[in-house]
């Protein structure tokens, strides 16, 4: 009987722990990255925000802010274009490999909301559900797709945004970057402050699937949550030399 009671207690304790963990896509705090796109700043970028309640919030990027409101059970669209504030030149990451200071988009709301992110131009379109900061992890594997060999602007890519200052990140890319600054399968470290984005793009025909990204502890500070996005600037699907294709754009799950 004692053994049976002990097993029941362990099961109940585990259930309570699982119930206490909130993995919902609803939240009050989000980090968005717009990774590189074959059309650069010409690309149109939009955020779609909804909630079952009325909500008020602020979008911040690159020192600019954009207040917004959400009516319950309706969708609010925030467009980041060259004619709005902030402009998409503040938000899109065009660095081949390197750090974009304050390129992370921070969304804060007074009420739980759901956020979707979209980047497009002409017939090319990519979108992702955005995970709230409370469910972000510290360790990720990248999924991507081969870029187009014959196009200099077609690259496999991933990007990392820090949610806190002094975030130390270790990265082991599955392929070298387009500038050959970071060899394949060799771990390197970067340090990011809150809102900074590190983007990594492959050479043509590259595929960064399998790249490993981990937030690590520093002296006197624990490892910190990060958001990771991946995809391609442009890919042809099923036919490597096709004349049409799409960018791929997805936030990674921890």
Feature locations, PLM:
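Bacterial Sec-dependent N-terminal signal peptides
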Residues: 1-24
